[in-house]
From Swiss-Prot:
CDD domains: Complex1_LYR_LYRM1 (cd20261)
Gene Ontology annotations for the cellular component aspect, listed alphabetically: midbody; mitochondrion; nucleoplasm
Role summary: May promote cell proliferation and inhibition of apoptosis of preadipocytes.
Family label: Belongs to the complex I LYR family.
Gene name of the encoded protein: Lyrm1
PANTHER family: LYR MOTIF-CONTAINING PROTEIN 1
Highest taxon of source: Eukaryota
Protein name: LYR motif-containing protein 1
Length: 122
């Protein structure tokens, strides 16, 4: 990891913690605010710990883009949770033979940038 990339990652990490400190739930209730703040901090710690050993500059850049997108989406919609994608598991047209592999490939390609670190299939 280059010094500039390290600086950018640390800046994002600090900005997430500042965001969590100032976060207000859209409902305005204190319980929701506390729960959402805890979620933001837990999610940030988990994902940064998961990706701390990455060495490929391209993967690091993708994680930075994902982090930035999640921050922007969270601020815009006032929801700290990732927005779901609405593609049913077998929602694409079925084909014979390699059709299932094609569906899996299309499903991976259709996954938004802000959900790349989540492993579950929506």
């Amino acid at each position: 990891m280059t010094a500039a990339t390290r600086q950018e990652v640390l800046c994002l990490y600090r900005s997430i913690f500042r965001l969590a400190r100032k976060w207000q739930a859209a409902s305005g209730q204190m319980e929701d605010t506390i729960e959402e703040k805890q979620y933001i901090l837990k999610e940030a710690r988990t994902l940064f710990q998961k990706n701390k050993n990455l060495t490929d500059p391209e993967l690091i850049k993708q994680c930075i883009v994902e982090c930035t997108a999640r921050i922007e989406i969270g601020l815009h919609y006032q929801i700290p949770y990732p927005r779901p994608i609405h593609l049913p598991p077998m929602g694409l047209t079925a084909r014979r033979g390699r059709g299932l592999q094609t569906q899996e490939k299309l499903r991976k390609l259709s996954k938004p940038v802000y959900l790349k670190s989540h492993d579950e299939v929506s």
